[in-house]
């Protein structure tokens, strides 16, 4: 593939953008390709190269790049009527009504502008509602670029994971390994009266798609109930992707107190949202005392894009299509790995997928989960399938990024930039895309 135009654009970008990009995950090695346009389930770069796109904007594009007419029309109509007003509009009410009808735990919402802003506001809300300061998060979990959760360490021995964050922020953040019920019990035994909330993704979507073991979320729910703490589900990635319109919490039959949304709920435009029980969400100003505000919150173009995307998904069996393709892709990947790299692990659920370059596996794969690790104890891979973020870091992450990612790109498949970020299937993908992707995986692996 020729990449002369992308190389030239990257050189220009380096002189005016920090690192040449506006998000660190876009800085692929040796340099990123620059996208000219999207086309259905594909992207075309500045040099005219076409790729099957499994990045999908890192999750927001449930329908792909070629939007259905009803979505395009709604976006164009609201843009033509004026970009924004600094006043409420009907479409933000309609989108909130749609979400509250379909997500059982959500009675009320507050829209914001990004997943990070949603989790920042959710943490502030939990602290304000409970009158407590400490937050429990999962080791290696990611909840956006916010000071309260950019921490590393174990238990209450934590420190900021980035320069520029005061040590005092980490003092109020407690970390536990995902899927470790004993650690969850221990942190509540020691700090239960001070814990405002547990903040977790239903599935670790930013750290290798780590699926919960059976009963783990029930344990978190019970611990929060016993100690008067709130359970916050970060569904920025899984929301309206895993579990369809009921989201991952519906798939796992868990009712969190607060849910954060992003990505799909904005239909490809900048968005975030905090939802939950009315009693809690009404603590936001102006109804309550927990300050929250934003110039672009509830932006009418974003609200229209999100509403029509979700309506289209509900009316056209989008979830049936993308989930079927996801299962076919993961099953095909397992067949390839069984032959070429049996120690590697296929992970994912519904329209999410990834191959983790784990270093060990069982002697026999007979009876393994059919389409990716689901943390089933009867599966021969159960002891080897990553259960925490730490497990994923122990895989061959450098080989994945340095060798595997470029090999897939050279075969026309666009994957997320490292072993940690999830990959996604959209409604515009086809069976042919899946077959071509499997051939590329077979060659690259």
From Swiss-Prot:
It is found in: Cytoplasm. Its EC number is 5.4.3.8. Its cofactor is pyridoxal 5'-phosphate. InterPro entries: 4pyrrol_synth_GluAld_NH2Trfase, Aminotrans_3, Aminotrans_3_PPA_site, PyrdxlP-dep_Trfase, PyrdxlP-dep_Trfase_major, PyrdxlP-dep_Trfase_small. SUPFAM superfamilies: PLP-dependent transferases (SSF53383). GO terms for cellular component: cytoplasm. It holds the Pfam family Aminotran_3. The modification N6-(pyridoxal phosphate)lysine is found at residue 263. Pathway: Porphyrin-containing compound metabolism; protoporphyrin-IX biosynthesis; 5-aminolevulinate from L-glutamyl-tRNA(Glu): step 2/2. It catalyses: (S)-4-amino-5-oxopentanoate = 5-aminolevulinate. One of its GO terms (molecular function) is pyridoxal phosphate binding. Keywords: Cytoplasm, Isomerase, Porphyrin biosynthesis, Pyridoxal phosphate. It is an enzyme of class 5 (isomerase). It comes from the Archaea. GO terms for biological process: protoporphyrinogen IX biosynthetic process. PANTHER family: GLUTAMATE-1-SEMIALDEHYDE 2,1-AMINOMUTASE (PTHR43713), GLUTAMATE-1-SEMIALDEHYDE 2,1-AMINOMUTASE 1, CHLOROPLASTIC-RELATED (PTHR43713:SF3). Belongs to the class-III pyridoxal-phosphate-dependent aminotransferase family. HemL subfamily. This is Glutamate-1-semialdehyde 2,1-aminomutase. The gene is hemL.
């Amino acid at each position: 593939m020729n990449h002369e135009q992308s190389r030239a654009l990257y050189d220009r970008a380096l002189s005016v953008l920090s690192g040449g990009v506006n998000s660190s995950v876009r800085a692929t090695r040796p340099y990123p390709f620059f996208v000219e346009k999207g086309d259905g389930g594909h992207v075309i770069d500045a040099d005219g190269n076409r790729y099957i796109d499994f990045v999908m904007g890192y999750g927001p594009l449930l329908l792909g790049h070629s939007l259905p007419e009803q979505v395009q029309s709604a976006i164009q109509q609201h843009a033509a009527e004026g970009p924004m007003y600094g006043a409420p509009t009907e479409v933000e009410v309609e989108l909130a009504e749609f979400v509250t009808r379909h997500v059982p735990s959500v009675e009320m919402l507050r829209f914001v502008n990004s997943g990070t802003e949603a989790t920042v506001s959710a943490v502030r809300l939990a602290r304000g509602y409970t009158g407590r300061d400490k937050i429990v998060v999962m080791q290696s979990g990611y909840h956006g670029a916010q000071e309260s959760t950019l921490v590393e360490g174990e238990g209450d021995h934590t420190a900021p994971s980035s320069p520029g964050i005061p040590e005092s922020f980490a003092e109020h953040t407690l970390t536990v390994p995902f899927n470790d019920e004993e650690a969850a019990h221990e942190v509540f035994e020691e700090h239960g009266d001070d814990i405002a909330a547990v903040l977790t993704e239903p599935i670790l979507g930013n750290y290798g798609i780590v699926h919960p073991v059976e009963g783990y979320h029930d344990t978190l729910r019970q611990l929060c109930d016993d100690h008067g703490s709130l359970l916050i589900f970060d569904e920025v990635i899984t929301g309206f992707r895993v579990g369809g319109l009921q989201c991952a919490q519906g798939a796992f039959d868990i009712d969190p107190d607060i849910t954060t949304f992003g990505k799909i709920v904005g239909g490809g435009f900048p968005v975030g949202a905090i939802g939950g029980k009315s009693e809690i969400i009404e603590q936001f100003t102006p109804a309550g005392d927990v300050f929250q505000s934003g110039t672009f919150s509830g932006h009418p173009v974003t609200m229209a894009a999100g509403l029509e995307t979700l309506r289209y998904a509900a009316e056209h069996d989008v979830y049936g299509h993308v989930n079927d393709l996801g299962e076919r892709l993961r099953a095909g990947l397992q067949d390839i790995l069984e032959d070429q790299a049996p120690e590697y692990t296929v992970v994912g659920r519904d329209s999410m997928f990834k191959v983790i370059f784990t270093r060990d596996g069982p002697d026999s794969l007979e009876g393994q989960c059919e389409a990716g690790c689901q943390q089933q104890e009867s599966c021969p891979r159960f002891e080897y399938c990553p259960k925490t973020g730490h497990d994923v870091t122990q895989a061959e992450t450098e080989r994945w990024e340095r060798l595997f990612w470029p090999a897939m790109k050279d075969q026309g498949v666009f994957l997320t930039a490292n072993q940690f970020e999830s990959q996604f299937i959209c409604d515009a993908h086809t069976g042919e895309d899946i077959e071509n992707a499997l051939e590329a995986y077979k060659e690259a692996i």
